[in-house]
Amino acid sequence: MSLAASALSALYARPAPQAPPHASHLRRNVMATLGLALVFGAAARVIELRPLELLHDAGNIGVFLRGYLHPSFAHLSEYAWQCVITVCIALWGTLLGAGIAVPLGLLGARNLAPHPVVYFAARRLMDLLRAVNEFVFALMFVTAVGLGPFAGMLALGIHTGGVLGKLLSETIESIDPGQVEGVAAVGAGRLHVISFGVVPQVMPNFLSYILLRFESDIRSASVIGMVGGGGIGFYLWDTIRAFNDREAATVILLIVLMVMAVDVVSSRIRRLAI
């Protein structure tokens, strides 16, 4: 074969030119943006999103809010005591949830589950506990144990157990396996491996999750009384339903102050303990 023929063959054998990497990356970003825009556009149509009506009805909103500008403090002590009950509901609900989360988190972690069936069952149970809202659990427990804070605490605890269990299992799955293998290498049993190889690695994050969930449970406990779960939520629903704007304003103000105080305290505890 001649030199010219070889050069011609090599020329045609070259691969087709490809688009620069940045061009394909830009194209993917544009397509992803258009896809998200279509999804949000369809969702806006489903929920009948009409933001201009807020401006059109701004006068009615102002009339509604003016009724809340002059809170009444005639029943302040009663409402304050209900806030204390609400904090206690959240406190024990979070504690119950943490207790439920520990076995579920251990069994629902892929690297600790004793069998795939156990792993699957623990995961699905956590999904169930997270999927059912606290209000639904509260309605169930009100039927079972009657009206009051105990039903609210059980509802919060069951739901919180699913949330914390999911977070704990994912934390366990991301731990350093070297420390676990080191404990197992000296002949330690499964309980000792968990105690000395797993717990020290996950405890700081788990405590942080518990404190964050306690803040969330405070907010949930503030309204769970609407369905008979005890606490300040019942008075919030009662005053709003009766169009007693001044009393409702007092209840809302106390709830806001309670949530702010709990957030500040839990943030300080988290910085000191973790």
Predicted regions and their residues:
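Membrane-cytosol interface at the C-terminal ends of specific transmembrane alpha-helices
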Residues: 147-213, 264
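C-terminal transmembrane helix and the adjacent membrane-cytosol boundary/short C-terminal tail
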Residues: 208-211, 249-274
